[in-house]
């Protein structure tokens, strides 16, 4: 009958509305993670890129005490906003006018005068192929050819240019093919993302290890990678939801970690106060748990605290101790707890009749001048050390499977300390008269 609404019309309308609202609530189509060459991000539009899985978000932000604007990446799901990457940290936008776009096959951030304040600075042979910028599920912001998803052929990626944070799957260290050195630089302060005073960099001479720098001065040394952890960070214990890896080959020397449970957020960060630390999110109370922080001890973790041929022990008084068979170089200064001069041998080495003292649970000495041979074990390492009159100490390069590889020191021994547990065995060469 004309003008009479049939009962199933209402049912159909209600069903349609229900489906519509469900789509609004749960459909991920509203979270866009790509930027094409015809699009842009503007501060005024309040648009952001959101990674698949909604873990990370890229957009513009300003800190609590500043009117300056930055382009950055943060955790999407956390109410306590935590920034993991900042593009223009040392060249902020002075006001709320800023645009991110693709121009000339480069990502470019423009200010209010349309002048570039940050760019990927790429030079490409073929500029005819369209490019796209994409925020990946792991927080990596990449630029690639629009038809090529191969990670090995990204034109540019934020993971190659970290700020103060190392995320899972990021690499810290050298790409030997390109010469790129990936390192961390702290924020100026907790509310200022500009480059701070501290940096954390890999030193690749001999046996690779990381150094914490305060400007041009080394403050702490990680110790070399021993197959499980860095020998100077014994607090970094194996976790069930995380896998660590250190790669050293002809193409790269780099540290990375990955999560076996991607629902857990964990990161390494260099704080504005100069602490390198492992932080993992605790969702039940909404804070970042600090698993460890390095340096831990203000004395024993300080670079070359005790001078050559001496080691630092937190359970001894004073904390600096000469190695067995050594005496303080300047006993008066030593008694005044001025330890920079270190220690000297009691008895000169004879070369042919020397032996070794075993020091347990040690942070290995600085390795920049050490000799490494990963093909031999500890017994052969001892023989090789004894056959070299310049050898002063030796140790395993890898502590797994009972110990493998050989590290030999032929100069002075610097920056050592001992631990209650999880250190390494170090064998120091002594004259027979000094062996106990």
Curated annotation (Swiss-Prot):
Tissue: Stigma.
PROSITE patterns the UniProt entry points to: BULB_LECTIN (PS50927), PAN (PS50948)
Transmembrane segments: none
Any one biological process term the GO annotation gives: rejection of self pollen
Signal peptide: 1-31
Lineage top rank: taxon: Eukaryota
Matches recorded under InterPro entries: Bulb-type_lectin_dom, Bulb-type_lectin_dom_sf, Pan_app, S_locus_glycoprot_dom, SLSG/EP1
Alphabetical list of Gene3D superfamilies matching this protein: Bulb-type lectin domain, Hepatocyte Growth Factor
Domain spans labelled PAN: 351-431
Record keywords, A-Z: Disulfide bond, Glycoprotein, Self-incompatibility, Signal
Sugar-modified residues: 46, 64, 114, 121, 245, 261, 390
The UniProt record lists the keyword Signal: yes
Alphabetical list of Pfam families matching this protein: B_lectin, PAN_2, S_locus_glycop
Domain annotation Bulb-type lectin: ranges: 34-156
Coiled-coil residue spans: none
Cysteine pairings via disulfide bonds: 381-406, 389-391
Function, in words: Involved in sporophytic self-incompatibility system (the inability of flowering plants to achieve self-fertilization).
UniProt protein name: S-locus-specific glycoprotein S6
Native source organism of the sequence: Brassica oleracea
């Amino acid at each position: 009958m004309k003008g009479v609404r049939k009962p199933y019309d209402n049912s159909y309308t209600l069903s349609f509305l229900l489906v519509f609202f469900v789509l609004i609530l749960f459909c991920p189509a509203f979270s866009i993670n790509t930027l094409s060459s015809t699009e842009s991000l503007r501060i005024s539009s309040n648009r952001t890129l959101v990674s698949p899985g909604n873990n990370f978000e890229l957009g513009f932000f300003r800190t609590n005490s500043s009117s300056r604007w930055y382009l950055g990446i943060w955790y999407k799901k956390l109410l306590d906003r935590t920034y993991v990457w900042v593009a223009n940290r040392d060249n902020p936008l002075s006001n709320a006018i800023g645009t991110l776009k693709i121009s000339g096959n480069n990502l470019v951030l423009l200010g209010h005068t349309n002048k570039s304040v940050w760019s990927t600075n790429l030079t490409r042979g073929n500029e005819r192929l369209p490019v796209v910028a994409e925020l990946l599920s792991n927080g990596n912001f990449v630029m690639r050819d629009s038809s090529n998803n191969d990670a090995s052929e990204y034109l540019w990626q934020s993971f190659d240019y970290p700020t103060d944070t190392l995320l899972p799957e990021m690499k810290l260290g050298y790409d030997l093919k390109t010469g790129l050195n990936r390192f961390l630089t702290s924020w100026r302060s907790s509310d200022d993302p500009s480059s701070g005073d501290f940096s954390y960099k890999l030193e690749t001479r001999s046996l690779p290890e990381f150094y914490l720098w305060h400007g041009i001065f080394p403050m702490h040394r990680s110790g070399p990678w021993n197959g499980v952890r860095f020998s100077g960070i014994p607090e970094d214990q194996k976790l069930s939801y995380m896998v660590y890896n250190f790669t050293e080959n002809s193409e790269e020397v780099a540290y990375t970690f990955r999560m076996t449970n991607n629902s857990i957020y964990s990161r390494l960060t260099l704080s504005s106060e100069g602490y390198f630390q492992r932080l993992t999110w605790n969702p039940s109370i909404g804070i970042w748990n600090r698993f460890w922080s390095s340096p831990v001890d203000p004395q024993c973790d300080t670079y070359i605290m005790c001078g050559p041929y001496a080691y630092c022990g937190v359970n001894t008084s004073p904390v600096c101790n000469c190695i067995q068979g050594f005496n303080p170089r300047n006993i008066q200064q030593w008694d005044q707890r001025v330890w920079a001069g270190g220690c000297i041998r009691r008895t000169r080495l004879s070369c042919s009749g020397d032996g070794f003292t075993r020091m347990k649970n040690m942070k290995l000495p600085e390795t920049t001048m050490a000799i490494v041979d990963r093909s031999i074990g500890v017994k052969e390492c001892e023989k090789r050390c004894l056959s070299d009159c310049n050898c002063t100490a030796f140790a395993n390069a890898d502590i797994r499977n009972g110990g493998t590889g050989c590290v030999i020191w032929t100069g002075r021994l610097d920056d050592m300390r001992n631990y209650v547990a999880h250190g390494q065995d170090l064998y120091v060469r002594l004259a027979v008269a000094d062996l106990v």
